[in-house]
Amino acid sequence: MDENENSQSPAPSHQYPKETLRKRQNSVQNSGGSESSRLSRKSFKLDYRLEEDVTKSKKGKDGRFVNPWPTWKNVSIPNVLRWLIMEKDHSSVPGSKEELDKELPVLKPYFISDPEEAGVREAGLRVTWLGHATLMVEMDELILLTDPMFSSRASPSQYMGPKRFRRPPCTISELPPIDAVLISHNHYDHLDYGSVLALNERFGSELRWFVPLGLLDWMQKCGCENVIELDWWEENCVPGHDKVTFVFTPSQHWCKRTLLDDNKVLWGSWSVLGPWNRFFFAGDTGYCPAFEEIGKRFGPFDLAAIPIGAYEPRWFMKYQHADPEDAVRIHIDVQAKRSVAIHWGTFALANEHYLEPPVKLNEALERYGLKSEDFFILKHGESRYLNTDDKAFEET
């Protein structure tokens, strides 16, 4: 039996085989003055949207978002079929839980046994990998969650679609209090319906959601009240923490959840700029010129989270998914002091061997004259602490 067959659902009471979106009747009355609003997108501190040296978001004639760089090529149905039919799958994920436990152990996060330790102070920055693109980041007196994915499948149904081969290290009920969630785009492995419902059930309007342009209505229909929807280069903050700026920055990807909604929602990365630390979350992306713009504008970053998996075959995946060498180039472009690898070791979404991404990452680092501690790998549930005073990491 697969290890996830008996795993706890992230949803409050039952599985959600389909997206039956609902809106709470009291979503406005109980919002505490923080109900979602597109007016909240107005910049309060920084505004680079009108400058000539940054790439703005762009729509095609059909009103849908497009990638504005020559590094992009549209995903076509013939190419999808060629990939699915003609290319060999080398992922080789073992069916044995014992072998998976040996190769990709899932650790119990520190905050389960010691919840009082959650929340670093002042200069500290701690990152915990919870699988795929989900990180818990503690910085500048805030606790953040990126692209929360706690369900068994990355799919509109929990009965079919890509199934995770490593369980989440914790449940949503075991998380410490989360201040904000960063969503990069609306694909099912990054925007998980059950996880959104469960987080909203637990934290309600106290939890601020930062989402791309076009996603506000979907979030509201899920009952989320405290949602900030941003375009590229727009920014906002968490109430009571206005010294930390959240900027929605570009990436090269695409969006889709249904047959007819291609690219009606924007995609992107996040730059979190605090008085002590700067954190960059790349989300899901191919390599493009945007990262050099981000590095020049907001770098250096104390920590960047950059995807390294789901990259084969390159003729098809390179436009939408960075491979380990692309990831190192992104690390350099955004001027990251350290980076953590994400988007690997959880779902088999492409054709490379499931253990290959870290190997290829270390090879790329050596070619670029970098060390493994510059761009590091975490086990599921593992944390690292970055002290910006001496730049030393401590495992937790």
From Swiss-Prot:
Give GO MF terms, alphabetically. Answer: bile acid binding; identical protein binding; N-acylphosphatidylethanolamine-specific phospholipase D activity; phospholipase activity; zinc ion binding
Q: Which tissues is this chain's protein expressed in?
A: Widely expressed. Highest expression in brain, kidney and testis (at protein level). Expressed in adipose tissue (at protein level).
Question: In which residues is Zn(2+) 1 bound?
Answer: H185, H187, H253, D284
> Which residues bind an N-acyl-1,2-diacyl-sn-glycero-3-phosphoethanolamine per the record?
Y188, H321
User: What are the transmembrane regions?
Assistant: none
Q: Give the enzyme's EC designation.
A: 3.1.4.54
Assembly, in brief, is: Homodimer. Bile acids promote the assembly of inactive monomers into an active dimer and enable catalysis.
Under what name is this protein listed?
N-acyl-phosphatidylethanolamine-hydrolyzing phospholipase D
**Organism from which the protein derives:** Rattus norvegicus
Lineage of the native species? Eukaryota, Metazoa, Chordata, Craniata, Vertebrata
Gene name of this polypeptide = Napepld
